[in-house]
Swiss-Prot record:
Single annotated GO MF: aspartic-type endopeptidase activity
Reactions it catalyzes: Release of signal peptides from bacterial membrane prolipoproteins. Hydrolyzes -Xaa-Yaa-Zaa-|-(S,diacylglyceryl)Cys-, in which Xaa is hydrophobic (preferably Leu), and Yaa (Ala or Ser) and Zaa (Gly or Ala) have small, neutral side chains
HAMAP family for the chain: LspA
PANTHER family, sorted: LIPOPROTEIN SIGNAL PEPTIDASE
Top-level division of the source organism's lineage: Bacteria
The protein's annotated pathway: Protein modification; lipoprotein biosynthesis (signal peptide cleavage)
Record protein name field: Lipoprotein signal peptidase
Lineage: Bacteria, Pseudomonadati, Pseudomonadota, Gammaproteobacteria, Alteromonadales
Uppermost EC category: hydrolase
Stretches that traverse the bilayer: 12-32, 67-87, 93-113, 133-153
Species this protein is from: Shewanella loihica (strain ATCC BAA-1088 / PV-4)
Protein family membership: Belongs to the peptidase A8 family.
Record's subcellular location: Cell inner membrane
Main location: membrane
Length: 170
């Protein structure tokens, strides 16, 4: 374990702040400028559309009656805490995992604030093809997905030396 936070993955916590601020500013802009379900077409496959998500990814448990708000709050706090502990234990040089963890934490905290403040998550990025729409999402969701993808990628392409340095597999 690194001897100080400066030598640990916590040095990457600026990514958490960046994701969180970008996510919250974008959602505040949507709330200030859009009515619920209002949509503005930007490209032939992309709209800004304000929707409320009471569930999780892809509106999972969206209509569950309200208890899911507290479940997802606990999950966000739990994962953010766990990933922060892991960041403290790993060297700052493990850039892929440190970036992944901080993206997930920033996204989780962005959506957590929505749940606590509004009781729902503000989603607005709406991609579609003809009449088929992908579920709307936000910057926090994107950060969580990219972070999860990096964690999976890292598990396939990296091995660690005893000092924590990455070594390519194969």
């Amino acid at each position: 374990m690194p001897s100080s936070w400066k030598e640990s993955g916590l040095r990457w916590y600026w990514v958490v702040v960046l994701v969180f601020v970008a996510d919250q500013l974008s959602k505040q802009w949507v709330l200030a400028n859009f009515d619920l379900r209002e949509s503005i077409n930007l490209l032939p496959f992309f709209n800004f559309t304000y929707v409320r998500n009471y569930g999780a990814a892809f509106s999972f448990l969206n209509d569950a009656g309200g208890w899911q708000r507290w479940l997802f709050t606990l999950v966000a706090v739990g994962f953010s805490t766990l990933l922060t502990v892991w960041l403290r234990k790993q060297p700052k040089g493990l850039w892929r995992l440190n970036l992944a963890y901080t993206l997930v934490i920033g996204g989780a905290l962005g959506n957590l604030i929505d749940r606590l403040q509004h009781g729902f998550v503000v989603d607005f990025l709406d991609f579609y093809w003809k009449t088929s729409h992908f579920p709307a999402f936000n910057i926090a969701d994107s950060a969580i997905c990219v972070g999860a993808g990096l964690i999976i990628l890292d598990s396939f392409i990296s091995e660690r030396k005893p000092n924590g340095e990455d070594v390519a597999k194969g």
